Amino acid sequence: MTKRAFCILLTLLTVSMCLRAQGYFCDREGAQLEYVRKNVKDGSVVWRFTGTVTKVADSGSYKDITTESEFTKPNGKPLYSSSVLQMVRVNNETQEVSVDVAGAMASYIKARAGLKADCGSVFSSLPADAQPGDVLPSVFAQAKVGPLTYDLKITDRKILRHETLVVPAGTFECVVLEEHKVESGPGHNRDVINHTWYSKGVGYVRHDSYIKGKLDTSEILNSITK
């Protein structure tokens, strides 16, 4: 083997090791990811939001990551009364990502309606070594707001394929996850099929929602500040 060939092989192996050492989430404290969601029918903007990694606490076995998202209307004014918090745990050995879905529900309800919700903690997982055909565990969460109960069911979670995706923020190697998401409760019911593109070290890059088989909204990563 020539010296040049050896260097190329070493580089490829290093890149491969780095990829395996990353999960499908951004763990760089201070990083900001800006997303834009649009209605597919007419191209109008539904919202924009910037997610900021505000805290990364490393215990040795895992990292606990806190993100804070600020949503704005198309005119730039705040969409909610406060930011939406999300807690994520990344296993340092396997790099599996676990998102506290129930906690995010509680924060969303507080931001949108100013109400306190009792949700507990329910996690949605995405392994770092996920491959096309893999089926992931379903997620069931519930929020109690006074006498009212809101349910969230995320089922039929499966990895569809690998795909290289180009968005305004750049070009990303992704896995595509399909999920059936049902939200139900007084005054709020939504039944969608979601396709989400995840890239290692970043998180999701694109998020499409289908209603009755028809693409309804598409959300893309517009920029990322590291």
Labelled PLM ranges:
Residues 6-10:
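Sec-dependent N-terminal signal peptides
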Residues 22-86, 90-91, 140-226:
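Acidic, serine/threonine-rich low-complexity disordered tracts
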Residues 14-18:
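N-terminal signal peptide c-region/cleavage motif recognized by signal peptidases
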Residues 61-134:
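Contiguous hydrophobic, core-forming segments of folded domains
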Residues 33, 101-168:
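Secreted/surface-exposed cysteine- and glycine-rich disulfide frameworks
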Residues 1-5:
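Positively charged n-region of N-terminal signal peptides that target proteins for export
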